[in-house]
Protein backbone atom coordinates (compact mmCIF):
# COMPACT_ATOMS: atom_id res chain seq x y z
CA UNK A 1 0.00 0.00 0.00
CA UNK A 2 1.39 3.35 -1.04
CA UNK A 3 1.69 6.08 1.56
CA UNK A 4 2.21 8.77 -1.09
CA UNK A 5 -0.69 8.13 -3.49
CA UNK A 6 -3.70 7.01 -1.48
CA UNK A 7 -5.82 5.92 -4.45
CA UNK A 8 -3.21 3.98 -6.47
CA UNK A 9 -5.07 1.58 -8.79
CA UNK A 10 -2.10 -0.41 -10.13
CA UNK A 11 1.34 -1.60 -9.06
CA UNK A 12 4.20 -0.99 -11.48
CA UNK A 13 7.10 -3.35 -12.16
CA UNK A 14 10.29 -1.35 -12.48
CA UNK A 15 12.61 -2.08 -15.40
CA UNK A 16 15.75 -1.25 -13.40
CA UNK A 17 15.41 -3.50 -10.36
CA UNK A 18 12.33 -5.64 -11.17
CA UNK A 19 10.49 -4.58 -8.01
CA UNK A 20 6.77 -3.90 -7.71
CA UNK A 21 6.06 -0.33 -6.61
CA UNK A 22 3.01 1.91 -6.37
CA UNK A 23 4.69 5.24 -7.17
CA UNK A 24 8.05 6.82 -7.97
CA UNK A 25 8.47 8.05 -4.40
CA UNK A 26 8.13 4.47 -3.13
CA UNK A 27 10.91 3.39 -5.51
CA UNK A 28 13.16 6.24 -4.40
CA UNK A 29 12.73 5.18 -0.75
CA UNK A 30 13.76 1.55 -1.28
CA UNK A 31 16.30 1.81 -4.13
CA UNK A 32 19.81 3.19 -4.27
CA UNK A 33 19.54 4.17 -7.95
CA UNK A 34 17.28 6.39 -10.07
CA UNK A 35 14.20 4.92 -11.72
CA UNK A 36 14.84 3.66 -15.26
CA UNK A 37 12.10 5.10 -17.47
CA UNK A 38 10.81 2.96 -20.33
CA UNK A 39 7.94 3.29 -22.78
CA UNK A 40 6.51 -0.15 -21.94
CA UNK A 41 5.19 -0.81 -18.44
CA UNK A 42 4.13 -4.02 -16.74
CA UNK A 43 1.29 -3.36 -14.31
CA UNK A 44 -0.87 -5.32 -11.88
CA UNK A 45 -4.42 -4.11 -11.37
CA UNK A 46 -5.25 -3.78 -7.68
CA UNK A 47 -8.91 -4.59 -8.35
CA UNK A 48 -8.65 -7.90 -10.25
CA UNK A 49 -4.99 -8.73 -9.36
CA UNK A 50 -4.09 -9.55 -12.98
CA UNK A 51 -0.95 -8.40 -14.77
CA UNK A 52 -0.93 -6.60 -18.11
CA UNK A 53 1.38 -4.46 -20.22
CA UNK A 54 0.85 -1.05 -21.72
CA UNK A 55 2.88 0.95 -24.20
CA UNK A 56 3.20 4.65 -23.38
CA UNK A 57 3.66 6.59 -26.58
CA UNK A 58 2.14 9.42 -28.61
CA UNK A 59 -0.86 7.36 -29.78
CA UNK A 60 -2.44 6.57 -26.40
CA UNK A 61 -6.20 6.90 -26.35
CA UNK A 62 -8.78 6.78 -23.56
CA UNK A 63 -9.20 3.00 -23.75
CA UNK A 64 -5.54 2.58 -22.71
CA UNK A 65 -6.40 4.09 -19.31
CA UNK A 66 -8.42 1.02 -18.25
CA UNK A 67 -7.43 -2.46 -17.11
CA UNK A 68 -7.99 -4.86 -20.04
CA UNK A 69 -9.29 -7.54 -17.65
CA UNK A 70 -11.80 -5.73 -15.43
CA UNK A 71 -12.11 -2.20 -16.94
CA UNK A 72 -10.79 -0.56 -13.77
CA UNK A 73 -9.83 3.04 -14.62
CA UNK A 74 -6.24 3.39 -13.42
CA UNK A 75 -5.22 6.73 -14.96
CA UNK A 76 -6.87 9.07 -12.47
CA UNK A 77 -5.97 12.14 -10.45
CA UNK A 78 -3.81 11.12 -7.51
CA UNK A 79 -5.05 11.70 -3.99
CA UNK A 80 -2.13 12.46 -1.73
CA UNK A 81 -1.89 12.81 2.02
CA UNK A 82 -3.14 16.20 3.17
CA UNK A 83 -1.78 17.72 6.34
CA UNK A 84 -4.32 18.39 9.05
CA UNK A 85 -4.89 22.12 9.42
CA UNK A 86 -3.95 23.50 12.81
CA UNK A 87 -6.71 24.76 15.05
CA UNK A 88 -6.92 28.51 15.47
CA UNK A 89 -5.30 29.90 18.60
CA UNK A 90 -7.77 30.96 21.23
CA UNK A 91 -7.30 34.53 22.53
CA UNK A 92 -7.68 33.09 26.05
CA UNK A 93 -4.55 30.96 25.61
CA UNK A 94 -1.32 32.39 26.95
CA UNK A 95 0.99 32.62 23.90
CA UNK A 96 4.08 31.87 26.01
CA UNK A 97 2.86 28.30 26.41
CA UNK A 98 2.87 27.64 22.66
CA UNK A 99 6.67 27.45 22.57
CA UNK A 100 6.83 24.80 25.29
CA UNK A 101 7.93 21.60 23.54
CA UNK A 102 5.90 22.50 20.41
CA UNK A 103 2.77 20.83 21.76
CA UNK A 104 -0.46 20.58 19.83
CA UNK A 105 -3.07 23.17 20.65
CA UNK A 106 -5.49 20.49 21.83
CA UNK A 107 -2.90 19.20 24.32
CA UNK A 108 -2.30 22.71 25.65
CA UNK A 109 -5.98 23.33 26.09
CA UNK A 110 -6.36 20.07 28.01
CA UNK A 111 -3.54 21.03 30.40
CA UNK A 112 -4.59 24.64 30.90
CA UNK A 113 -8.29 24.02 31.41
CA UNK A 114 -7.92 21.40 34.15
CA UNK A 115 -9.28 22.34 37.53
CA UNK A 116 -7.39 21.65 40.72
From Swiss-Prot:
Zn(2+) 2 binds at residues 16-17, 27, 33. Its main location: cytoplasm. One of its GO terms (molecular function) is zinc ion binding. GO terms for biological process: protein import into mitochondrial intermembrane space. Keywords: Cytoplasm, Metal-binding, Zinc, Zinc-finger. Zn(2+) 1 binds at residues 2, 4, 23, 26. PANTHER family: CHY-TYPE DOMAIN-CONTAINING PROTEIN, ZINC FINGER PROTEIN. Pfam families: zf-CHY (PF05495). It is found in: Cytoplasm. The keyword Cytoplasm applies. A zinc finger (CHY-type) spans 1-72. It comes from Schizosaccharomyces pombe (strain 972 / ATCC 24843) (Fission yeast). This is Uncharacterized protein C3B9.05. Zn(2+) 3 binds at residues 45, 48, 67, 70.
